[in-house]
Amino acid sequence: MNVLNKEVFNQTKKVLGLIVSNKLVNGFSKQFKSYMFQSPKFKPIVSTDNDDKKMIYLCDTLKKETDIPDQLKTFIKENDIKVIEKDISLNYNNFSYEQVLKTLLPKDVGIPFSFERIGHIIHVNLKDEQLPFKYIIGQAILDKNIQVKTVLNKVGEIDTVFRTFKIEILAGEPDLVAEIKENECIFRFNFEEVYWNSRLQYEHMELVNTFKKEDIICDMFAGVGPFALPAAKIKKCKVYANDLNPSSVKYMKENAKTNRLESKVEISNLDARDFVKSLVEKSIPFTHVVMNLPSTSIEFLDVFRDIFLNSTIPPPIPPPIINCYTFTKLDESSDLIKDTIKNVENVIGAKVPSDYVCYEVRDVAPKKSMMRITFRMPTILPYVGSLTTASTTTTPTTSNTNTSTTTSTTSTSTTTTESTNTNNSANNVEDKNNKKRNSTEDSNETNETDSIDTNKKLKN
């Protein structure tokens, strides 16, 4: 059974009809709507041969007059309404998506209700037991969703370096170039050539809302720009965006032009590590790093470890705030947040500062979650810019006990800033969508170059 047979739904039903005066129709519709015949694209109120009266069809559960509830019986009697039996004709168009698939699929095959909408495209992930009926499911989705032109199914897992996957068109046109509006920006791209996930729309804006106008953003795995373009358009940030996929870069450039952001977004097509190194070599003081490649993002933290922890040469920029998305598997004895932090620390070879923010973005599979961890990259060296003013600048740094002050001098090249980072506070952290979010003990740290402004990071 691979083709949807619409003729199966051609049928005639016997229902009760009421001949109602025109002046009573509106009142009847409001008071007794639940008793009227309800079906997609079916009009339960129709004209009659008498211009002063309308026919109102009752729901098919009221098969005879004795089935009519007392309240409706009273209304019928008081207004001298005639009750008759009528035949109505129904076809495929009069049945909902769920009704169609309940009719056509075996009882032990579930109906897919969860799918992603990308412009005119609907993307489904069918289960094994649904695959023999994939074309029926695809056609039903196409027919029952307005403005949808293409229905496709993912074939296999995301296993390419560009995060793309093989697809199969189940119904509709083979047009995979979609255009959508998200977070005040227009995005256009070929869904087969790039990575896009509409389910992350809220998370895209959640992170962008932590940025300020003066921030400079380094987006290492930018895709077609779901973080980069809103950061530039809504927050007016300067953005350096990169992706290894030439198709992503092509569409990101087009999208930047469409949204008039060419002067705010500089786009590269490099390996992510080379991209970061190029910005550092140019002394571009990016303040936030976005790392949205959950399967391998954490591995790329080594580029920051080499710049801020392993190098003997002071970096030309201050340590940025890292916003890293990653997948974390949850075993019975483990904790998502603790495991995420541990995975980060294993790569950077240092403790994550105590003012980190870490929470679960969404479940992606049983015992596997997409996480976001935000922290300032620790360092053991002052950046070059701080050395030029060290002899004349005094930076008070108050410890947790409020008893000590550290003064910067030209001999501070060996000063450890990691220890001050661990005293920073994470205030006003909300519980987003009842998911875990963690920040540790408060302190009075005031060194702006070493602490994360959590009022900037999270909504109060």
UniProtKB/Swiss-Prot annotation:
GO terms for biological process: mitochondrial tRNA methylation; tRNA N1-guanine methylation. Residues 390-428 have a biased composition (Low complexity). Keywords: Cytoplasm, Methyltransferase, Mitochondrion, Nucleus, S-adenosyl-L-methionine, Transferase, tRNA processing. Residues 442-451 have a biased composition (Acidic residues). Residues 390-460 are annotated as: Disordered. PROSITE patterns: SAM_MT_TRM5_TYW2. It comes from the Eukaryota. It is found in: Mitochondrion matrix; Nucleus; Cytoplasm. GO terms for cellular component: cytoplasm; mitochondrial matrix; nucleus. Its EC number is 2.1.1.228. The keyword DNA damage does not apply. S-adenosyl-L-methionine binds at residues 204, 243-244, 271-272, 292. One of its GO terms (molecular function) is tRNA (guanine(37)-N1)-methyltransferase activity. It catalyses: guanosine(37) in tRNA + S-adenosyl-L-methionine = N(1)-methylguanosine(37) in tRNA + S-adenosyl-L-homocysteine + H(+). Monomer. HAMAP family: TRM5. Specifically methylates the N1 position of guanosine-37 in various cytoplasmic and mitochondrial tRNAs. Methylation is not dependent on the nature of the nucleoside 5' of the target nucleoside. This is the first step in the biosynthesis of wybutosine (yW), a modified base adjacent to the anticodon of tRNAs and required for accurate decoding. Belongs to the class I-like SAM-binding methyltransferase superfamily. TRM5/TYW2 family. This is tRNA (guanine(37)-N(1))-methyltransferase. It comes from Dictyostelium discoideum (Social amoeba).
